Amino acid sequence: MKKKIIIISSLGAFLIILGVVISILVPPEIDNTGYTLIENLKVPVYSKVKVKDLITSIEGKVITNKTLNTEKLGKQEVSFVYKNKNDKEKRGVFTIDVVDEEKPLVWLSGSYSARVGSNLNLEDEIFCTDNYDSNPTCKIEGTYDLNKAGTYNLTYVATDSNKNEERINFTLNVYEPAPATTTQTPAPAEEREEVVTAFNDVVATHKDENTEIGIDVSKWQGDIDFKKVKDAGATFVMVRVGSQQGVDGEYVLDPYFKQNIENALANDLKVGVYFYSYANSKKEARKQADWVLDQIKDYELTLPIAFDWECYNSFNQMELSLFGLNEVAESFLEKVEDKEYDGMLYGSKNYLNSIWKYHDYDVWLAHYTDQTDYDSHYVMWQLCQDGRIDGINTAVDINVLYKNDTK
């Protein structure tokens, strides 16, 4: 009798397990009648879209609200599971079209000036890139002669591989140099009062229960008395660990890094570091992260490692899309987070809005103003570069850190 009970119990358990396996391996039947999709199923490339974003109504609820892969252009079948009004699992299937309809990004001045005989290269002066295409066609329409004085009306045209086009008109003024005149003793320059931002004023304006006030430093600040810095009210410091000497250049340790980080830690300041990068590939960025990790291995950081990339003058020659540049930054930050450090991306407001659009990392915002209107997520705000604080004899950047990790 016991043997029969054991056999029956084992069989029951087997059937339950078999049912679970079948439910996993055999998807629910397709039923596209229980929901309604939006009319236009064109999805912008690199956009963060979930299944629910494309459904206007459903008789039940979505079970698998997955994020769609939008990194590849073209038609893509989407399959998801939902429960219908009868609480039965069904499968919805539809097709989206991932498209690139974004114009290339062009930054230029409304007018340029050059002396007759100048070797000005306008193509190098103008920033031209694209969200998807790593090598958009960028050209100047119209004729001009750098050896002939005059005003030339020109048009800068940028076209990507998906035929998106940006056209911007601008003016080139080619001028003759002014004739030499008799040398005269120049009038004495007016003395102007130096405009500075006092650390105490920043504390008075921005310190509250959710914020801390600190600084970021490098070799440009020289020798620092961190005891005075702390006594002045600073609670943290971001220390430059080093920089890259141009595109494909060597990595150089900031000559003040060791004394800065050691003295900051000795005075019980919270410490993070940043690296000034010219990386033009994911491989290069990971290599830089390894280098930074090696420099900081003997120190205890309580704040993030920041990736500081600002070489926009060299960007035209890098053959990177905007998405590709974001991948470069992510490669650096992924590497440091793999070693259980926090990663952070440094950028100014305009660059964060226009260029650093395809990442999910914390942001160190640079925006020199009393009250920033940057409306995306950031954890630290560099609000000035002309700060003054006891313990430092030169100007210094002042920062606000948000304790709840968000602003």
Which sequence ranges carry the predicted segments?
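Solvent-exposed, low-complexity, repeat-rich "mucin-like" stalks and linkers
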Residues: V26-E59, E102-D133
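Hydrophobic alpha-helical membrane-insertion segments, chiefly the h-region
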Residues: L15-L25
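Aromatic-lined carbohydrate-recognition surfaces of secreted/lumenal glycan-active proteins
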Residues: E340-N353
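Functionally critical loop-and-helix segments that line ligand-binding/catalytic clefts
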Residues: T182-V217, Y358-K407
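Extracellular interdomain linker/stem segments of modular secreted and single-pass surface proteins
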Residues: D97-L105, N173-T181
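Serine/threonine-rich, repeat-prone extracellular segments and beta-strand-based repeat modules
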Residues: S57-F94, D133-V174
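Substrate-binding cleft of extracellular glycoside hydrolase catalytic domains
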Residues: K207-A232, M238-S331, E337-K339
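N-terminal Sec-pathway targeting helices
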Residues: M1-F14
